[in-house]
Amino acid sequence: KATATCQLHMREFRDGDEIVIEPFRAAGFPVVRDLAVDRSPLDRIIEAGGFISVNTGAAAEANLTPVPKEAADQAFDAAACIGCGACVAACPNSAAQLFTSAKVGHLGLLPQGQAERWSWTESMVEAMEEFFGSCTNHGECSEACPKEISLDFIAFMNRDYMKAKIRNRSLAGQH
């Protein structure tokens, strides 16, 4: 079974078993040399909006903002994504929906992310679409994910993306 080497334990093999080590094979990850692949397209998604920008000084202390337990648990689950790219490599379409949705979900579920939620959701999804294939719901990504990120985050991201497109289009018309 194909898996990330960080999730592979030698105790799972018997003496004489053959082990094949090769780089992730995905259109979004061109091989640079030997076992190294260029994973910079994942960085482009984060650069497109995978952060919260807040002017310091006037902002309230983040620890004083109440977060409902369910939202905190879901955000924590999404934040568990380590950005390894196993989801992209496992997908027959080389899609990065699970990675992107984990980043969108992590920020979008917290009160601190609400101010910029629609702009970075749109930017991150569009950056993802520039570098990776489209999701056709095979679910291989979630199966390969070492952090067991749920496919539910893809639905969350798709919903937020549609809301963002509608909202941002409405705002663009209000000049």
Q: Model regions: which residues?
A:
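Ferredoxin-type iron-sulfur electron-transfer modules in oxidoreductases and energy-metabolism complexes
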Residues: I21-A27, V31-H175
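Hydrophobic/aromatic-rich structural module bridging two neighboring secondary-structure elements via a short loop
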Residues: K1-R25
